[in-house]
Amino acid sequence: MSYLKHIRQDLQDMQAYTVQNATGMVKLDAMENPFPLPEQLQALLGEQLGKVAVNRYPGSRIEDLKHAIAQHVGLPAAYGLMLGNGSDELISLLSMACQMPGASVLAPEPGFVMYAMSAKLQGLHYIPVPLRDDFELDEPAMVDAIRTHQPAIVYLAYPNNPTANLWDVAVIKRLIAQVSAYGGWVVMDEAYQPFSPETWLHEIKRDPHANAQVLLMRTLSKFGLAGVRIGYMLGRANVIAQLDKIRPPYNISVLNAECALFALSHAQVFEQQAADICHERVRVSQQLATMAGVTVFPSQANMFLIRLQGDENVATRVFEALRQKHILVKNVSKMHRVLHHCLRITVGTSSENDQFLAALQEVLA
């Protein structure tokens, strides 16, 4: 008897999402905010969490959190907001909501792996469209794929992961118009917005009619709360009301909600951390640009890509050599053709970044 008899074969054929062991490492692999909660706030948060009624299901504090986020982002009139247990859950709920015979999801690649995984798990056809070699959207290929498949959802990460760039606004506007014409949805994924000079929310407010079929998704992970798992999505109130029907009723724990409310009440602390990260991003990029055999690409996120000169295995060798020096980065060189010879590095603290730069210099010597 097979113990896997009733487990879907396509699920058995998938590869599980893996998290690297970071014990004892300088952790620069997961685009986290590297700064812990300041000591002066730790006691305050502990006191606040100690008062939470953990014996009760989440109640009115979830609505308080939605209101706080709406104020924080400047939610447009006639728009609604829904919460997810991280953006991952929101992506899964979108796939579930659009699961109909023949429905499809489209996204540029390389991109966030959960777009494809969630679509496939819900039985949706997934359509990847490769980026150009310069990491820009291939507009003719996107237009052709959208015309052919009319996907229910088109994901556009702004900035993109792992390439860390913002795509051309004019191209995005034309794609939104094309998808909107047949009633599809464009999801602008702004996970890395705290480190970016741009947000599509400005376009939504400037021209709500042209962006009526746009959903905007963000997370508090990059804000500084990766361990709290809070994602949120903005859209027309009538649309969010429909999507919210499939959200599990208690998907946000009372402790997570309280942590998020606390963080938003001290938003200036996290905004300063984001500014410090952006400053470090510039400094580290400038240092990398001076290293022989290293190409560093522009970034509008809390990460950047470097391309190493050498044979097809150079990125793997450098990745392993850095790991031996207790520096953990992300080897993306085999993820997609356009990422050949590439490593992705999270911007850490000044000390962490200095350790990375010194280790890389030694490895390349």
Predicted feature residues:
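PLP-dependent aminotransferase class I/II
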Residues: 38, 213-290, 294-297
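N-terminal small-domain helix-loop-helix segment of the aminotransferase-like
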Residues: 2-88, 93
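PLP-dependent aminotransferase-like
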Residues: 97-156
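Conserved PLP-binding catalytic core of the aspartate aminotransferase-like
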Residues: 278, 291-325, 343
